[in-house]
């Protein structure tokens, strides 16, 4: 029985891994009748609050936004930085961001787990994204080991995904 249980757990793990490889990031960002991906509160209240909170701690230099969605927060970051790189898994979200912002930012269509970034960054912003990742620890490790410049700063906001309001 122990071997049988071990085998079931292994199959379950393989099924989970297979499911993770088939994620459709374009579908995940779509609003439906019973699910909204983003709310006006995020844009009208949270975005200005986060910018005010981050602003005194931003370093001069470049910025990497991980999970740029449709560019709404990116627009606010572009008011403060000349060089902004955005990594987003949804091609549809990148297309919409480009329609809004043009070529003011550099867009990389990739998952964080596999992104090949050209440099290190003085500021890295990860807002309302960590809870969506398949392996958040691995992504945080990449941020620290590969992408954050010496003396760079990580700005991380993670909502309580299990809050009663969600």
Residue ranges and their predicted role:
Residues 128-132:
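Short catalytic micro-motifs in class I SAM-dependent methyltransferases
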Residues 137-153:
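A short glycine-rich, Lys/Arg-flanked "PGG" loop and its adjoining helix->strand segment in the class I
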């Amino acid at each position: 029985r122990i071997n049988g249980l071990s085998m079931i757990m292994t199959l379950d793990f393989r099924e989970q891994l297979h499911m993770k490889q088939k994620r459709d990031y374009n579908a995940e960002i779509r609003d439906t009748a019973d699910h909204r991906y983003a709310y006006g509160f995020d844009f009208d209240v949270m975005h200005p609050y986060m910018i005010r909170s981050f602003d005194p701690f931003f370093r001069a230099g470049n910025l990497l936004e991980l999970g740029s969605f449709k560019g709404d927060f990116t627009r606010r970051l572009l008011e403060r930085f000349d060089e902004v790189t955005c990594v987003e898994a949804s091609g549809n979200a990148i297309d919409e961001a480009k329609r809004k912002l043009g070529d003011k930012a550099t867009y990389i269509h990739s998952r964080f787990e596999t992104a090949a970034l050209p440099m290190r960054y003085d500021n890295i912003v990860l807002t309302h994204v960590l809870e969506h990742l398949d392996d958040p620890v691995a992504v945080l490790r990449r941020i620290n080991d590969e992408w954050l410049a010496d003396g760079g700063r990580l700005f991380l906001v993670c909502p309580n995904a299990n809050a009663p309001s969600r």
